[in-house]
Amino acid sequence: MNNQYILIIDFGSQYTKLVARRMKDIGAKFIISSWEIKKKELLKKNIKGILLSGSPMSVLDDKSPYVSKDILNMKVPILGICYGMHTLVKQLGGKVERKSVREFGYASIKILKNHSNLFYDNFEVSEKNYTKRQKVWMSHEDSVINIPKGFSIIASTKNCKYAAIFNKKNKFYGVQFHPEVTHSEKGYLILNRFVKNICNYTNVIKYSLSIRKIILKIKNKVNDEKVILGLSGGIDSFTSAILIHKAIGNNLFCICIDNGLLRNDEILKIKNLIKKVGKINVIYINHKKRFLKSLNGITDPEKKRKTIGNLFFKIFQEQADILKAKWLAQGTIYPDIIESSQNNLLKKDNFIKSHHNVCPLPKGIKLKILEPLKHLFKDEVKKIAKKIGIPKEIIFRHPFPGPGLAVRIIGEIKEEYCNILRMADEIFISELKSENLYFNISQAFSVLLPIKSVAVMGDMRKYEWVISLRAIETLDFMSANWANIPYKILNNVSNRIINEVRGISRVVYDISNKPPSTIEWE
């Protein structure tokens, strides 16, 4: 019983793995478990504390998940996060309601005088980690309106009286916000205090990303069989390619497909990048007409993603048959899986969006799947990429979705629309680079909207399309802020797009954060 663990109860939140990530940062061993786990399953584990995750569900739903009473009676500290706080409150006799005012994104919490150890506010010189107000990240519609007997308020916001609560006797805590998200400015410190000071967790370990272990795992899994990998030009597929190549050498074949939905001169750029990473087998294929034909008449974003994903798989299988390859490698990372996952306790419409590399394999696909990065976040992938010598322009190249421009053209896909968007996007990115802003922004791109707007050009009335610019700043792509690009630069981008791209009459800038908005529009 020397090993100590923090138990993370998963209610289907997209942030559950992010909670686990924070445990890794803190140095705590953890177990992620379904909410249906029973106490008897944990008898041989030294559980020092419990974290209850968020959820897309509501405790007001008839079939809302909850932990069993024997878990609540384990006599260890418990911290409920968002939904986790709601279910804790409801099970202990409090009340939760859906309020007319929702909170998504930043909120300022005021820490009250009757603080707990969770919000340590000793303001001596050596302990100024906390202030009486903190910025936190909210994502909720329901709110606690009555707390159970024995609980006190720790913090409030303008719209949420019970932003944080605690029961001193039982060491039960609840926070309405998400401390696991990097945008909660003191979130790490809150979780760190819960684990080390409240749970008295002492078995601190140092997690490390072992490249050698990843390569060895690939080698042992694949043996002497051939692997094909869809190379997109982004950091995820490039890092996967280098790791797999180190493991199996020339048994790796990278497939680079021009599907007509790529950025401007993308294939040429990929060829130039390949020269910088070494001798890797790359096969270039042009399937523009095939992809555009398959998307004819489709407007629903999920159907677009699945159509593209299925066609990718079919082409990979065709190439695998030619090469006699048994494996398909993908640069899937954990946020892809989170957005595509459907927990079995959830309704079907609670998943966020499908990713082409996380779709179920279509019929007729015989390939085995290899995903060396699937448990890693983007910042972890960047650390590995840097260690294995991948050039900076790949590491910090902005992500590009697998379905490409298809999810940046709202509505039906036409070659004409692709050309318009490609030109607008190239202008936006080139302006960011010329102003030395590109590498300071996590992701930037243009979106072609399915609406037209009136303009006057050369004394003539024009009724043409609208482009939306999107730029965000983020560490792990699980939450994001819109990038505060100077007006002068936005003005230059807008003028150039309207003057240089035929068919565009108006340019707008997207100032939505994640959550609630996803980074991509579709």
Swiss-Prot record:
Pathway(s) this gene product operates in, as recorded in its UniProt entry = Purine metabolism; GMP biosynthesis; GMP from XMP (L-Gln route): step 1/1
Q: Which domain of life is it from?
A: Bacteria
Cite the active-site annotation: C82 (nucleophile), H178, E180
User: Which residues bind ATP per the record?
Assistant: S232, G233, G234, I235, D236, S237, F238
In the UniProt record, the signal sequence range is: none
The cross-references to InterPro entries, in alphabetical order and at most eight, read: Class_I_gatase-like, GATASE, GMP_synth_C, GMP_synth_GATase, GMP_synthase, GMPS_ATP_PPase_dom, NAD/GMP_synthase, Rossmann-like_a/b/a_fold
Q: Which GO terms describe its cellular component?
A: cytosol
State the function annotated in the UniProt record.
Catalyzes the synthesis of GMP from XMP.
**What quaternary arrangement does the UniProt entry report?**
Homodimer.
What protein am I looking at? GMP synthase [glutamine-hydrolyzing]
Question: What gene does this protein come from?
Answer: guaA
